[in-house]
């Protein structure tokens, strides 16, 4: 029902049924790692790759949703590794007290990374959430206010391609109350599983000169969601906006391309070596010599 529309923000729910589509056919990553068991093995392989390269055991802190804490991190003598896979930190709208705890957790992580030479940020399979939270995290990696994206909303009653004026959204490091900023070389890991607010994070990070992205294109699911009930009381959401990069490029449907393309396959499980992490380490070693 929703598949021909090729839009991951279109959902129809009712009578126990849920119709949605994540931009057409399964992505190469989804074809390779097509169930929860394989994805669990994928992350185990990532952790083994880090261990093989003298990183410590991956630790986790923060709010827990569906058995998974918000932030994952570890470090070697020279480099840090930081992962977060959602921008809805509590699974619901987060409150002021929640944000206080989130900032405390982020401060704990990045104070421990202060003396390191470089950082890997892994957002592969980031499921989305709140764009504001993505900017909250991105504000840890810049010392100046930067334009992160533009948005435009459809004009009510207007033509299909009629939108209001561009609205700029900024990453402001002065608004995140960080006790430590990381301004050294960063490699950002992406893939087709990064959607919505995860892509907002990627787009913002792409504006920073010390960041290199590695992996594959993101999902290309950016729009705000217009939610309403159909006459039969089924719930529906439609896309009613568009997001543009600071240079006014549209990535809806195509996703944001990385600087360097590296693809994960099931063969990585057999080798217990993640080529995306290995490329990130190669880049960091080159940039920090």
Regions found by a protein language model. Name each.
Residues 81, 85-89, 114, 118, ...:
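C-terminal "post-core" interaction segments
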